[in-house]
């Protein structure tokens, strides 16, 4: 009997093995017919079966363990006709099949279910916004030019500190805690000094994933958020481009094939080039003179170029480079400029007989900044370095295995004088090595997405294990519960204090060695900044046109490094009896952020509406006292509307209204004469003219007035010859001219406001 059972078990195992062996795999890429660009997030399936997949950002799809036979593979996505191909799958073989989708030329008569809504059922998708150029352009085009940073300001949990020199604070994290990737390359400062524009040209973007909390182990080195930006490959069919000009800026975009495909078995090469230039510092002297007697002293220039070589199988390699410049020149007050440049390559490799997709990148980037003020010593900061990585993605029907390795090396060089006139210098070289593993498993209605990252920081000899987890449960076809969390660490810190309200100077430095040995009575064992995230949420598709998303989150920043504003002594043996809080250049703090974000979206034919409400609480703890950081905004509301008119949908009206409760502010308590003993005891204080010092009140215990602003734009498209159109845009920033307080000059008691009403006009020609 026992022998029979053994034979029976062996036979069953053999049968299962043979059954698995008698299956096939189909994989490939989906492309757009009009320009040869990959089509991301399209639904691909075998007609009449349950086998289905979604294309990734490269247009890649894969389906495995398919019984041999004849099938029709189909691809669908919003705005395109369904593409299909008949295939015959053979056991133990792999079919590579390319699909080409044609754009619809007729007005939508009914609402189509987008692939984005379908992917919500198979991906955790918590605390992440996928942003497309079409969505960016549905907002008012401020300065007659839509921009990613304008869209970022309406993303749930994101707070902008101002129109001039403003930065983005994402669910309690500071800008240095937000990792920005452009085609896999690290960008250290993605936003220009005037807070309406980023360094990215909207027309070259393919997709931007904004992770606001709880992101997976494929991302490391930051403790708050990630912006992963992917650009287009360039038109593979014909030479085309766009030329635009307005009252704020002008730009030129050119793209086209370097080598066209002779047939479907031939490879291609293409390019895309964007040049963007702002002349607001010149036009504002006449058009916006009411905003400032000297005009608005902001100017910038951005250049980005990319060359892509594609094989017939879908494998590709890309080479890219950029140069970004930004300048601010307040006459007789301050001069500020920064520059960023870099280049690199990335590739996607699809081995013919393998189910694995291999991706890799290698890039170098540099960022330097300098601020010269009339009454202060100059400050400067430099960070440059490389990053490289390889990751492997393995598809098992709806399951995925993703693993990889990343190496980053960078140098920081920093010079700064704090409020106590103490000089702070640091020059460091550091290397970070990270490996990660991620496995996504779908079990009926449950999606499990665990991952782990192991990160080594060579300059401080610290090792950081970072487990993370994402979960989703499909309660029904239209209601889903989700959660995510994990541990995070980073080395890079900002070269300015979290307490600074207005600071154009935004530099970087790596984790310093001279941290205090204790915090809040406990010994400090690590030099890294550390955080823990937890996010829970619910998605509800009310109907085909209307859905709601609610997320609650916690970020526990259990160790932060900040510049010490109270540093008045050198950390030498002569000052051994002084506490670390007055002699260390840097201090340790803790932070805690919690909040709830509610998003309602409505999309039906010509109308798009979006309501975002954010409730947030952020605190910092120095060990001696607790305070609210300057970006702590209790309530933030954004209402967005977009409507298309005309038979050809050639008119569009866009509007956005933003309300924010007041930011924390520290008030003055008085003034005193400050004597600078430059020569020590030999200083003749009777001949030394003192400087005016400020006695500050309790840190950030008061609040600025509430902020609100309405922006509107109107667009008209004139269809010219084939593939050519002229678009005219009129926009108004701050329609009702609300005087929103930016900051108060402590010495002169002058109130400096955000941008006033600013109408603009622009036109663009696409060809």
Where on the chain are the PLM-derived regions?
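Outer membrane beta-barrel strand-and-loop segments of large Gram-negative receptors
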Residues: 385-389, 428-436, 523, 527, ...
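N-terminal periplasmic accessory domains that precede
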Residues: 95-100, 148-151, 166-168, 195-201, ...
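Periplasmic N-terminal accessory/gating domains of Gram-negative outer-membrane beta-barrel systems
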Residues: 88-91, 110, 119-215, 232
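Periplasm-facing N-terminal accessory domains of Gram-negative outer-membrane beta-barrel systems
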Residues: 20-110, 114
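Transmembrane beta-barrel wall of Gram-negative outer-membrane proteins
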Residues: 25, 248-279, 290-327, 335-358, ...
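Surface-exposed extracellular loop regions of Gram-negative outer-membrane beta-barrel proteins
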Residues: 368, 413, 458, 478-533, ...
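C-terminal beta-signal and adjacent terminal beta-strands/loops
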Residues: 658-690, 703-711, 715-767
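Gram-negative outer-membrane beta-barrel transporters
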Residues: 442, 554-556, 575-664
């Amino acid at each position: 009997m026992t022998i029979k059972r053994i034979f029976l078990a062996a036979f069953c195992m053999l049968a299962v093995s043979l059954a698995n062996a008698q299956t096939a795999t189909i994989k490939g890429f989906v492309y757009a017919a009009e320009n040869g660009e990959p089509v991301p997030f399209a639904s691909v399936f075998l007609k009449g079966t349950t086998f289905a997949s979604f294309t990734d950002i490269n247009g890649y799809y894969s389906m495995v363990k398919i019984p041999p036979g004849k099938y029709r593979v189909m691809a669908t996505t919003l705005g395109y006709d369904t593409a299909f191909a008949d295939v015959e799958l053979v056991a133990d073989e792999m079919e590579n099949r390319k699909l080409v989708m044609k754009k619809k030329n007729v007005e939508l008569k009914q609402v189509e279910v987008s692939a984005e809504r379908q992917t919500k059922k198979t991906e955790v998708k918590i605390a992440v916004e996928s942003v497309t150029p079409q969505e960016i352009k549905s907002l008012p085009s401020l300065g007659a030019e839509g921009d990613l940073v304008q869209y970022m300001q309406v993303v749930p949990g994101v707070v902008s500190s101002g129109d001039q020199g403003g930065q983005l604070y994402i669910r309690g994290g500071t800008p240095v805690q937000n990792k920005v990737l452009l085609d896999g390359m690290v960008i250290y400062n993605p936003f220009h000094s005037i807070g309406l524009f980023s360094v990215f040209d909207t027309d070259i973007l393919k997709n931007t994933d904004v992770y606001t909390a709880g992101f997976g182990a494929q991302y490391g080195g930051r403790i708050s958020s990630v912006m992963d930006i992917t650009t287009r490959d360039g038109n593979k069919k014909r030479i085309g481009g766009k030329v635009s000009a307005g009252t704020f800026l002008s730009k030129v975009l050119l793209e086209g094939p370097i080598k066209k495909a002779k047939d479907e078995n031939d490879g291609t090469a293409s390019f895309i080039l964007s040049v963007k230039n702002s002349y607001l510092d010149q036009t504002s002297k006449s058009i916006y003179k009411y905003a400032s007697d000297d005009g608005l002293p902001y100017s910038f220039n951005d250049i980005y170029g990319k060359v892509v070589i594609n094989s017939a199988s879908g494998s590709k390699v890309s080479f890219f480079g950029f140069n970004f410049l930004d300048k601010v020149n307040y006459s007789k007050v301050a001069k500020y400029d920064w520059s960023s440049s870099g280049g690199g390559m990335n590739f996607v490799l699809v081995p013919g007989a393998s189910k694995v997709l291999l991706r890799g990148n290698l890039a170098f980037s540099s960022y330097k900044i300098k601020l010269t003020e009339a009454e202060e010593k100059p400050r400067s900061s430099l960070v440059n370095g490389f990053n490289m990585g390889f990751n492997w993605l393995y598809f098992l029907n709806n399951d995925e295995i993703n693993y990889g390795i990343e190496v980053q090396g960078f140098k920081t060089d920093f010079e700064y004088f704090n409020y106590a006139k103490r000089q702070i210098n640091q020059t460091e070289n550091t290397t970070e090595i990270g490996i990660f593993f991620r496995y996504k498993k779908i079990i009926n209605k449950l999606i499990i997405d665990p991952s782990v990252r192991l990160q080594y920081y060579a300059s401080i000899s610290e090792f950081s294990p970072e487990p993370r987890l994402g979960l989703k449960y499909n309660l029904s076809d239209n209601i889903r519960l989700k959660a995510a969390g994990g541990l995070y660490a980073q080395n890079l810190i900002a070269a300015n204090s979290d307490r600074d309200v207005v600071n154009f100077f935004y530099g970087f430095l790596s984790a310093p060695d001279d941290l205090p040995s204790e915090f809040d009575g406990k010994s400090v064992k690590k030099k890294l900044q550390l955080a823990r995230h937890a996010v829970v949420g619910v998605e509800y598709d009310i109907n085909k046109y209307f859905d709601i998303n609610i997320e609650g989150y916690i970020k526990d920043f259990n160790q932060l490094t900040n510049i010490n504003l109270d540093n008045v002594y050198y950390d030498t043996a002569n000052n051994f009896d002084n506490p670390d809080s007055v002699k260390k250049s840097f201090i340790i703090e803790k932070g805690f952020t919690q909040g709830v974000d509610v998003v309602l979206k409505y999309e039906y034919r010509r109308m798009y509406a979006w309501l975002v409400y954010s409730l947030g609480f952020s605190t910092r703890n120095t060990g001696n006292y607790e305070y609210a950081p300057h970006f702590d905004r209790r309530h933030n509301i954004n209402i967005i509307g977009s409507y298309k008119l005309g038979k050809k949908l050639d008119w569009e009206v866009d509007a956005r209204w933003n309300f924010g409760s007041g930011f924390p502010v520290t008030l003055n308590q008085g003034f005193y004469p400050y004597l600078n003993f430059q020569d020590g005891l030999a200083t003749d204080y009777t001949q030394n003219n003192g400087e005016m010092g400020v006695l500050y009140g309790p840190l950030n215990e008061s609040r600025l007035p509430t902020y609100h602003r309405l922006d509107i734009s109107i667009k008209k498209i004139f269809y010219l010859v084939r593939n050519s159109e002229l678009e005219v845009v009129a926009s108004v920033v701050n329609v009702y001219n609300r005087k929103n307080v930016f900051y108060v000059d402590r010495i002169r008691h002058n109130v400096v406001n955000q941008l006033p009403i600013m109408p603009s006009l622009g036109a663009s020609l696409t060809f």
